[in-house]
Amino acid sequence: MIGLKQLSDTLLNEASSLAQLRDALNAFTQRCSDVGGILPDRSFNAWAGDALLKNGVAISPAAAAHCVNDTQRSVVFIRAVYAAIKAAQARFAQGPVEILYAGCGPFATLLLPLLGRFEAGELTVHLLDIHQRSLDSVDLLISDFGLQAHHISCTQGDACDYQHPSHPHVIIAETMQKSLEQEPQFAVTANLAPQLHPQGIFIPQQIEVDLCLAKLNEETAAVKRGDTLDSDALIAAGQRHRLATALCLIPAQAATLQQQASQNNAGLLELNPMHLRMPTTADLSDFEPALFTRVQAFEQHQLIDYEWLMVHGSWLKGARQGPRGRIGWFA
């Protein structure tokens, strides 16, 4: 049975192989499932126990547990969280560092493996999730991993409108699907970022969604073969055309972007439509409009095209091809 020291040593070690990282996360998942009683399930569908919120979908505890299996995503964010906490300790030397982890899921994956590296009293941790079942699981894990001496509280609530009583030094909010299409990452960021301490750290620091014309079938096939794709090289070779940055979500600007959004007939917020002119010098018959999501979790800890399951290129819904080669896209 894996312990927190062995787990965090493996996950934070840049020399760990992909197989070692995967094995460590699998062992963590198995222990968490055995203790908390929640088995990972990738069933992202209407019967999965998801919570339908006004600002998106809060996936079920079982689906959230399955996200641990996205190895690169989990490792990059865990390393980012550790680096952010160490940076916060340097900034707020009087301590303790206050952390709010929104959408923690049943395993608190991005933080729990790290807590054993800190002394009790160094951190004050607030865990927030819409599902009480997830919080019940985390509570069992805190006891099982021997973390009772740490200052950890659990709150059931919607991160889209949750109001924290203080200004945390670190906020972790990783509640996204590809291209931010379902889970409420945008609304969560817009609500929580203004509550951050002025010198605090928000994770992720930036999410960028690029609108491109791409040969998605070819790119996906190449990735499945094990090829490494370089977006800049694809663009230089004319195999992908970058049209625009559809969205750049920076925590400090999220609330303003939300205020500028309009409400559609269904009562949902929509960003302003984009109208783009298609390239005229290339044969575009084999290309399709697609969105690519890139994430800067913290400083050098980043996820780019095809490095993780949620940022694979996604076919663009809501694209309208208009006269003179223009595309109108509605977020």
Regions found by a protein language model. Give the residues of each.
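Class I SAM-binding transferase module
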Residues: 3, 10, 14-32, 43-53, ...
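Short helix/strand-capping turn motifs
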Residues: 36-38, 42
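Class I SAM-dependent methyltransferase Rossmann-like catalytic core
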Residues: 50-89
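Phosphate/oxyanion-binding active-site loops and adjacent basic polyanion-contact surfaces
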Residues: 66-81, 103-110, 130-134, 181
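Conserved class I S-adenosyl-L-methionine
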Residues: 93-107
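Conserved SAM-binding loop of SAM-dependent methyltransferases across substrates and taxa
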Residues: 105-121
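Conserved SAM-binding loop
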Residues: 138-139
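Conserved hydrophobic residues forming the short capping helix/wall of the S-adenosyl-L-methionine
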Residues: 142
